[in-house]
């Protein structure tokens, strides 16, 4: 996979079937749930350097997720997407609910439970293959 990013915030970043959006755009809809990724983002077996202040989502969920005011369980994604469970979409996050690798938006009614705190990212397929349906806390 490859990516094309500007320095600092992304204007747009594509890799594989995923889109990466800048936090400035994200904050227009979700100012209280901004998601940040570290300078090195692990996606599958590849490392992407220089990734900052972004969140990622599968392109297949782009319309339903980005236009919604909040992330609801009605935002469905393909079952075979590495960042999606059969019911909800997961997003990369680093700082929030402690130092966590992969987490999800909407902690509470729509969020998955955050993974154990730590500095390293979890492999996406490992995360999505497990059943995280408790709320964040």
Curated annotation (Swiss-Prot):
One of its GO terms (cellular component) is cytosol. This is Keratin-associated protein 15-1. The keyword Electron transport does not apply. InterPro entries: KRTAP_PMG. Keywords: Keratin. In the hair cortex, hair keratin intermediate filaments are embedded in an interfilamentous matrix, consisting of hair keratin-associated proteins (KRTAP), which are essential for the formation of a rigid and resistant hair shaft through their extensive disulfide bond cross-linking with abundant cysteine residues of hair keratins. The matrix proteins include the high-sulfur and high-glycine-tyrosine keratins. Pfam families: PMG. Interacts with hair keratins. The lineage of its organism: Eukaryota, Metazoa, Chordata, Craniata, Vertebrata. Belongs to the PMG family.
């Amino acid at each position: 996979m490859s990516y094309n990013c500007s320095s600092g915030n992304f204007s747009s970043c594509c890799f594989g079937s995923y889109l990466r959006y800048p936090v400035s755009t994200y904050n227009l809809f979700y100012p209280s749930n901004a998601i940040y990724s570290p300078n090195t983002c692990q996606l599958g077996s590849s490392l992407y350097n220089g990734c900052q202040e972004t969140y990622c989502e599968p392109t297949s969920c782009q319309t339903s997720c980005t236009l919604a005011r909040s992330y609801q369980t009605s935002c469905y994604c393909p079952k075979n997407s590495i960042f999606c469970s059969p019911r909800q979409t997961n997003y990369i996050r680093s700082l929030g609910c402690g130092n966590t690798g992969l987490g999800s938006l909407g902690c509470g009614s729509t969020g998955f439970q955050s993974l154990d705190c730590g500095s390293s990212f979890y492999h996406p397929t490992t995360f999505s293959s497990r059943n995280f349906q408790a709320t964040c806390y």
